[in-house]
Amino acid sequence: RMDFLATTVQEALTHPDLPARIDVVTALHACDTATDDAIAFGLAKHASHMVLVPCCQAEVAGVLRQHKALSLSRSPLAELWRHPLHTREFGSQITNVLRCLQLEASGYSVTVTELVGWEHSMKNELILARRMTDDRHGARERARQRLVQVLDELGLPELKARFAVDQLASGSSTVTA
């Protein structure tokens, strides 16, 4: 049985008609930061599964663009996003990598695959996340460390709050069975 509520993701976090735990969170072609809102909702509601098809990621590309000159002086890898088209595409790719690391650091097993063939849609990345009941040899902390390393290496430390690095370090997103 399905029920639908007309509410924002933020309001849904505390909506009295929603249970404390949600089985599945989906976000289909959720533009820009809407996928991040869905992830935050899923984490807050201890979702067992998340099915995400991100779209139009612009936030990370914007930060890359702001720091492009500094990045080019620091690392030859900044050539990956020197040109505007590459900035947009690389920003999109990195956004999804960061999302996957955030999910893994929060106790989810993550698989990334295609939704449909590339000939049908360029926005085609499907992120599947399944909540794990154990930490599997420190996988959460390794993912958290990698998340921090990627943000620092790419000159994106101001995005640590967006990807909840501090909450992950304090264990406030602890997975419960």
Language-model features: locations:
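Class I S-adenosyl-L-methionine
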Residues: 1-177
